[in-house]
Amino acid sequence: MERISLTIEKNLLKEVDEIINKERISRSEFIRRALEYYVKKYDWLSRIESKIGEITVIYNSKAVEDIVKLESQYKDIVIISLEIPFEGKIIRMIAIKGQRDRIIEFTNKLKGISSVELAQLTTISIE
């Protein structure tokens, strides 16, 4: 195994430590699992051409206009969008269908909106 050094924000480290205490694993094991998950997901996304899925977005009210505008720019892949207010934040579930590259591009643009805390893509293959 190789050894690496990692710098993360204090808040994120606190959250990681809470999880590893509950899971009873080391920081190294936690990071190893997270990296493996990310690599597998990236590999899977790169192999499938056409997809159907859902993007979960968590944000505050400042992002509403930007998200609605972005959805209209990607209306070729956005099927429907559902917005749920929850504990001072907004959870939006966006059903999507289309080409992998277009879906990934849309998801990345959602992540780039400053008031978006999370944009998580979940997909299945149409093959």
From Swiss-Prot:
One Pfam family it belongs to: NikR_C
Leader peptide range in chain numbering: none
InterPro entries assigned to the protein according to its UniProt record, in alphabetical order: Acetolactate_synth/TF_NikR_C, ACT-like_dom_sf, Arc_rbn_hlx_hlx, CopG, CopG/NikR_regulator, Ribbon_hlx_hlx, TF_NikR_Ni-bd_C
Keyword tags: DNA-binding, Transcription, Transcription regulation
GO molecular function: DNA binding
Disulphide bridges, residue numbers: none
SUPFAM superfamilies: ACT-like, Ribbon-helix-helix
Cross-referenced CDD domains: RHH_NikR_HicB-like
Gene Ontology terms: biological process: regulation of DNA-templated transcription
Family that this chain belongs to: Belongs to the transcriptional regulatory CopG/NikR family.
Listed name of the protein: Uncharacterized transcriptional regulator MJ0080
Annotated organism of origin: Methanocaldococcus jannaschii (strain ATCC 43067 / DSM 2661 / JAL-1 / JCM 10045 / NBRC 100440)
